[in-house]
């Protein structure tokens, strides 16, 4: 696969009220920081979030394809349905030897019944599909180099505590993970977007900058010319 303009890691995990995702807004041409303000977190349906890393044009193609498919069928599609649709689209492209260079996080709330029709609960669904159409489900999902740099950090902070983490703490964990990536991934930036889905629906923030401190990279005997 040839890359042109790409986006790096998406981080996502389950928390008490739903699913949260974070991604930076840089579009990289190789190692060149070519674009800023690139959206990589999208709302589809009424209870589903998509976070994508990989080729920017392939992200746009996938969102357009999902929009066309859902307009042709008025039935409500839940997060599991979108996950299956995306898996089929990516697997089909791979089978035609023209894969989409994408890793997609799919998260949302499914309406699930516990057996009593009068009682309904909300099932938190979080999964990932890669460019080959392979997929898995987990409490914590990171795409790209984030699977090496921040996945262990988030697993340590999140796993076993999913029902204890409030939204404010979840946003703080996403920001800390994105800060780690900004320090260690040359294609990441400190301008990020955070999206979450809960019982009130899907919410995606405007891009904003997180604080970073590069003093750790200075030596005491180093002379800095200002």
From Swiss-Prot:
Key words of the record: Cytoplasm, Nucleus, Proteasome
Biological classification of the source: Eukaryota, Fungi, Fungi incertae sedis, Microsporidia, Unikaryonidae
Record has Nucleus as a keyword: yes
Cell cycle listed as a keyword: no
SUPFAM superfamilies documented for this protein: N-terminal nucleophile aminohydrolases (Ntn hydrolases)
One biological process term in Gene Ontology: proteolysis involved in protein catabolic process
Function per UniProt: Non-catalytic component of the proteasome which degrades poly-ubiquitinated proteins in the cytoplasm and in the nucleus. It is essential for the regulated turnover of proteins and for the removal of misfolded proteins. The proteasome is a multicatalytic proteinase complex that is characterized by its ability to cleave peptides with Arg, Phe, Tyr, Leu, and Glu adjacent to the leaving group at neutral or slightly basic pH. It has an ATP-dependent proteolytic activity.
Subunit record text: The 26S proteasome consists of a 20S proteasome core and two 19S regulatory subunits. The 20S proteasome core is composed of 28 subunits that are arranged in four stacked rings, resulting in a barrel-shaped structure. The two end rings are each formed by seven alpha subunits, and the two central rings are each formed by seven beta subunits. The catalytic chamber with the active sites is on the inside of the barrel.
Name of the featured protein: Probable proteasome subunit beta type-7
Domain of life according to the entry: Eukaryota
Stated family: Belongs to the peptidase T1B family.
GO cellular component: cytoplasm; nucleus; proteasome core complex, beta-subunit complex
Localization annotation: Cytoplasm; Nucleus
Pfam families to which the protein is assigned, alphabetical: Proteasome (PF00227)
Matches recorded under InterPro entries: Ntn_hydrolases_N, Proteasome_beta4, Proteasome_bsu_CS, Proteasome_sua/b, Proteasome_suB-type
Predominant subcellular localization, coarse grouping: cytoplasm
